[in-house]
A protein has these predicted regions:
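Amphipathic, charged alpha-helical segments and their helix-to-coil junctions
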Residues: 22-177
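Sec-dependent N-terminal signal peptides
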Residues: 5-14
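Sec/Tat signal peptide C-region and signal peptidase I cleavage site
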Residues: 15-21
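Short, flexible, glycine/charge-rich loop motifs used to bind or transfer phosphoryl groups or to couple energy/partner
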Residues: 14-15, 129
Length: 177
């Protein structure tokens, strides 16, 4: 019986010391990306770039609305074949316009995702460096835990290192087909 207690005591001491000796840190990756000044500037540049296309899209949309109104007004004047031809032409133009809008949205969503991935890769490099320099065994994202001490949060440390980097965040302009 004493041997069982001794083995149990040794077992608990050996494994509990391993568990409690791990150093854990918390980082808010979402905040690091969203609050990065270079990222914010790049997103603003993208929005400015999008504006020139949005103006063209509004013009095209207005032209399509006018064309639809003209078709409605000419129903009494034109033959059924001519109306069907105009409707078919309108539907083709509307379809092309919708495809262009979808491509536009998809393009800029992908560009922002690529930019965020570049920043994330830099954050991961900084986290690896931080973990090695500070003997941190485990770094968790702030979305993967419920409650933790603020002393575990290294977001500000990583943010200051991230701000020192000169990130090259490029995006491609939208090209209509």
């Amino acid at each position: 019986m004493k041997l069982t207690y001794i083995i149990l005591f040794l077992f608990i001491n050996i494994f509990c010391s391993k568990i409690f000796s791990q150093t854990i840190a918390i980082v808010n990756v979402q905040s690091l990306i969203d609050n990065n000044k270079i990222y914010q500037k790049t997103v603003k540049d993208i929005e400015i770039n999008q504006d020139k296309y949005l103006k063209d899209f509004n013009i095209t949309e207005n032209e399509l609305t006018i064309k639809l109104n003209e078709i409605e007004e000419s129903k009494l004047i034109l033959s059924k074949e001519e109306i069907n031809k105009q409707i078919e032409d309108y539907n083709n133009q509307l379809s092309q316009f919708s495809i262009t809008i979808e491509e536009f949205n998809f393009h800029y969503q992908n560009e922002i995702i690529k930019i965020r991935e570049v920043i994330l890769n830099e954050i991961l490099k900084l986290l690896e460096k931080y973990a090695l320099e500070n003997s941190v065994d485990l770094i968790l994202d702030s979305t993967t835990y419920l409650i933790a001490s603020n002393s575990l949060d290294i977001t500000t440390d990583i943010n200051s290192e991230l701000e020192k980097l000169n990130l090259n965040l490029e995006y491609k302009d939208f090209e209509k087909n």
